[in-house]
Regions:
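Solvent-exposed interhelical
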Residues: 55-80, 112-129
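Alpha-helical transmembrane segments of multi-pass integral membrane proteins
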Residues: 108, 135-175
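Membrane-interface helix-loop-helix regions
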Residues: 1-53, 83-89, 101, 154-161
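Helical transmembrane-bundle signal
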Residues: 4, 133-136
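Loop-centered beta-sheet repeat module
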Residues: 61-62, 73-113
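Small-residue packing motifs within transmembrane alpha-helices
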Residues: 7, 100, 107, 129-132, ...
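Membrane-interface helix caps and helix-loop-helix hairpins in membrane proteins
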Residues: 39-45, 87-98, 138-147
Length: 175
C-alpha cells in the first residue's frame, strides 16, 4: 500500500495523458478496476486488474460451472466467444471485454475441462501437442477470428512444455 500511495502522489504531480481519479484508485484497491471504462488507462501499476479477473473467474466458476455438466462450460465458452467476435476488432467494447472474464473464458473454460477429463499423455503425444500448438500460435496470429483461439494454443503449449520438461528432469535423475 505504501508503494501505491507513492505512485498516486507521483502521478498527481507528473504531467501526463491520464491522471488517476478517486474512483480509479478505489477500483484498483477494490480489485474491480477492469470493470471501469477505459481499462487501458487505469490498470497500471501492478496486477490489480489480474486479481480482479481471478475473482471474476471464481464467481463464474462457483455460480455456473461447479458440479455442473461439461455442456455448461462449453456453452459459456461459446457465448463469450460470440460476444467478442461480434465486436469491432479495433473498438473499445472488445478492449473492455478482454480485461474481464468474457475475454479469458476460452482458456479458463478449457482449463476446467482439462482438469476434469484429461487423461495422462505419453511423451510422444506431448511433444506433438507442443509443436502443433507452437505452429498454431504463429499461424493463427494473422487473422482476427483465428486470433481469438491463440490463448488456447498458448495454454496447450505451456502445459505440454512443462510436462515434457518434468519428464526430462525425471529421466536425468535416473541416470
Amino acid at each position: 500500500i505504501v508503494g501505491f500511495v507513492a505512485f498516486t502522489m507521483l502521478d498527481a504531480i507528473t504531467p501526463g495523458a491520464h491522471h488517476y481519479a478517486v474512483m480509479d484508485i478505489i477500483g484498483q484497491m477494490g480489485l474491480f478496476n477492469n470493470l471501469l471504462p477505459h481499462p487501458d488507462d487505469i490498470i497500471w501499476p501492478g496486477p490489480y486488474w489480474f486479481f480482479g479477473l481471478m475473482i471474476q473467474f471464481y464467481i463464474v466458476y462457483r455460480l455456473c460451472l461447479y458440479r455442473r455438466h461439461w455442456v455448461w462450460n462449453v456453452l459459456l465458452i461459446a457465448i463469450c466467444a460470440a460476444i467478442q467476435l461480434a465486436c469491432d476488432p479495433e473498438g473499445e467494447a472488445l478492449n473492455r471485454w478482454r480485461y474481464n472474464f468474457i475475454g479469458g473464458m476460452l482458456p479458463f473454460g478449457f482449463g476446467v475441462l482439462y482438469a476434469r477429463y484429461m487423461h495422462p499423455l505419453n511423451t510422444a503425444t506431448l511433444l506433438v501437442l507442443f509443436l502443433l500448438s507452437l505452429f498454431a500460435i504463429v499461424l493463427m496470429s494473422f487473422n482476427y477470428v483465428t486470433w481469438y483461439f491463440v490463448p488456447l494454443a498458448v495454454c496447450i503449449a505451456s502445459v505440454s512444455f512443462v510436462k515434457l520438461a518434468s519428464r526430462l528432469q525425471v529421466a536425468q535423475k535416473e541416470y
